[in-house]
Regions:
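Jelly-roll (double-stranded beta-helix
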Residues: 1-302
Length: 302
């Protein structure tokens, strides 16, 4: 047996991710704003979901979500079905179709609304993404990730819409304030895919439809698998396989670097201290966020 030169070290192999815990969607039913609502996850313990705060699934026709404020976070809204009409008090307005995403940075303060176009129907998933303390009061902005601007990865039996970050060399259109990778993947029956994930990221995988084997754990629609950051000199991988022989599976997967900062929650505001929450309410009621618009509904012409 020959000697191996000391300087011929092979690069470290990718580490396979595990699912550390699983959470179940909580169905709430209709309320004054929506026809139906479910909480995919909520910030009962923000340290376990950091940097993600909440993921809510809504089905609505009328009234939807009329004018309301936000500060200190980003909302990432994926249209599952129907058409979502949106607008804000900075003059932005638009309408998004199935598969498209609205990435709104509330930052220092914004007033916006989200409605079903023509009061017909909208089915959306809205995630609340925390902002670092240094970016809590960053200027507000909108990013509409339309089909035309959204890159897609296609391999045999797999279609992946990349929202943010870089997946297999394909970079999503969202400009993010801290490292985040996000996608929605559709896998045909018994198809599989291996996703590379930065080791420092916390990851969630929400099964929207069907059944999936995720990192060796089978999850069905309505369940979310969580994978915590790991120490590894190489990228980590998450293996996916659609296990239902008759139906495809669809999954939303987001990962991001935990902020590891205090979280203070107050209605539509997310800051680092209770005093900052109180200031947000004072600023909103004092008009600092600007006036509530009185604009007419959109003329949807896409």
């Amino acid at each position: 047996m020959g000697l191996v030169p000391l300087d011929s070290e092979e690069p470290p192999m990718d580490m396979e991710r595990i699912i550390n815990r699983v959470t179940d969607k909580q169905h709430l039913g209709p309320d004054a704003q929506v026809d139906d609502k479910a909480l995919v996850f909520v910030p009962s313990d923000p340290a376990l979901t950091d940097p993600f705060l909440a993921l809510v699934e809504d089905w609505f026709s009328k009234p939807g979500f009329e004018w309301h404020p936000h500060r200190g976070l980003e909302t990432v809204t994926t249209v599952v079905d129907g058409v979502l009409e949106h607008g804000d008090n900075l003059g932005h307005a638009g309408a998004l179709e199935p598969g498209e995403v609205q990435w709104m940075t509330a930052g220092r303060g914004i007033i916006h609304r989200e409605l079903a176009y023509r009061d017909e129907h909208a089915h959306v998933l809205q995630m609340w993404l925390n902002l670092p303390a240094a970016k809590k009061l960053t200027p507000s902005r909108y990013q509409d990730l339309t089909r035309a601007a959204m890159p897609r990865i296609e391999t045999p039996g797999v279609r992946i819409d990349v929202h943010a970050g870089t997946v297999d060399g394909v970079t999503g259109a969202a400009d993010t304030h801290h490292p985040v990778q996000g996608l929605v993947a559709t896998l045909d029956p018994e198809s599989s895919y291996t996703l590379q994930v930065p080791p420092e990221h916390r990851l969630f995988a929400y099964v929207m439809n069907g059944r999936l084997l995720i990192a060796g754990r089978e999850l069905h629609a309505g369940r979310t698998g969580w994978s915590d950051p790991v120490e590894s000199p190489a990228p980590t991988t998450l293996h996916l396989m659609a296990t239902d022989p008759d139906h495809p599976a669809r999954v939303m997967i987001y990962s991001g670097t935990p902020l590891r900062e205090p979280v203070a929650l107050g209605g539509p505001f997310v800051m680092n201290t209770k005093d900052e929450i109180a200031q947000a309410f004072t600023d909103f009621h004092g008009g600092t966020f600007g006036p509530v618009p009185r604009t007419a509904r959109l003329a949807y012409d896409r």
